[in-house]
From Swiss-Prot:
Binding site for S-adenosyl-L-methionine: T139, G163, D185, N232
Name the UniProt record assigns to this protein: Ribosomal protein L11 methyltransferase
Catalytic activity: L-lysyl-[protein] + 3 S-adenosyl-L-methionine = N(6),N(6),N(6)-trimethyl-L-lysyl-[protein] + 3 S-adenosyl-L-homocysteine + 3 H(+)
EC number: 2.1.1.-
Length: 298
């Protein structure tokens, strides 16, 4: 049936979540969602039947096992089933509910309403196939870091969000009072998701500029640099991008870096300090960490 979807379920170690997300996205999946299953994590993702044959799914299962082996984790267990479009549209959404993050944020799926008498800043999100629902520890750490940074320094800021995903961090920064956020992502699906969520949260495009690309695009848009940088992507990509990110920075610029496993923190720190950055704080959650950095003062 042309309107059928494969529902792919992966049971894995929690530490593999971001790797599994990446692999499923690279495979072409949409609507990824996670749920805790005792000490494991269940990841569900969906792809149209016409885009994947059984041999493709078998190959995906093998790639997931190879990814886990390389990282030193137990092999994930994968299975799949066909479902019609109506079931797909509702199935993955069942796993995602309203959640509080930090002291000020409430993450609300687009199809739900926030509770009455809510006093928190509401971020409404429909992620589509983009990463960033607020359930991942790295997203939570970044939002909490933004909350601390922008609450303690309330003057208007210009911020760059590198690898914006669903736009959740950019939107959070605007709600906390950032003057303007420039969001970029190399994935066109992420760019579209961020634009949709900008509209969903009724944010003026003048306050949240969204472009496909990476740091080079930001350097053209913001030649005078930014006050803050948020970057929730893989550690290897952060390391590769730092020479360009340095060009975005002013002497007073701060940064929030995540997507980094605790075991990778030292490698990231080692390349930051020679390039003029100081790690002011390191927050951990599960196997993940977030580095709060600032320019080193001579």
């Amino acid at each position: 049936m042309s309107n059928s979807w494969w529902e792919i379920t992966v049971l894995c170690e929690p530490s593999l979540e971001e790797t599994v997300f990446w692999r499923l996205e690279d495979f072409g999946c949409s609507g990824t969602a996670t749920a805790k299953k005792q000490s494991s994590l269940e990841v569900k993702a969906y792809i149209p039947e016409i885009k994947a044959q059984l041999l493709d799914l078998e190959a995906l299962s093998l790639w997931l096992k190879q990814d886990a082996l390389i990282l030193g984790f137990p092999e994930p267990v994968s299975h799949w089933q066909l479902m019609d479009e109506e079931d797909w549209a509702s199935s993955w959404k069942q796993h995602w509910q309203i959640s509080e993050i930090g002291d000020r944020f409430l993450i609300c799926p687009a199809w739900l309403n926030p509770p009455e008498n809510n006093q928190r800043l509401v971020i409404k999100i429909d992620p589509g196939s983009a990463f960033g629902t607020g359930t991942h520890p790295t997203t939570q750490l970044c939002l909490e870091s933004l909350e601390m940074r922008l609450s303690s320094h309330p003057e208007p800021k210009i911020i760059a969000d590198i690898g914006c995903g669903s736009g959740i961090l950019a939107i959070g920064a605007i709600l906390l009072g950032a003057k303007k956020v420039y969001a970029v992502d190399t994935d066109p699906l992420a760019v579209n998701a961020t634009r949709s969520n900008r509209h969903l949260n009724r944010i003026n495009p003048e306050n949240l500029a969204i472009n496909q690309g990476s740091v080079e695009e930001l350097l053209e848009l913001i030649p005078d640099g930014v006050d803050g940088i948020v970057c929730n992507i893989l550690a290897e990509t952060i390391i590769a991008l730092m020479p360009e990110i340095n060009r975005l920075a002013k002497p007073t610029t701060w940064g929030i870096l995540s997507g980094i496993l605790v075991t990778q923190a030292q490698a990231v720190t080692d390349i930051l300090e020679p390039q003029g950055w100081t790690v002011a704080a390191l927050w951990k959650r599960q196997e993940w960490c977030c580095l709060q950095i600032r320019r080193a003062l001579d």
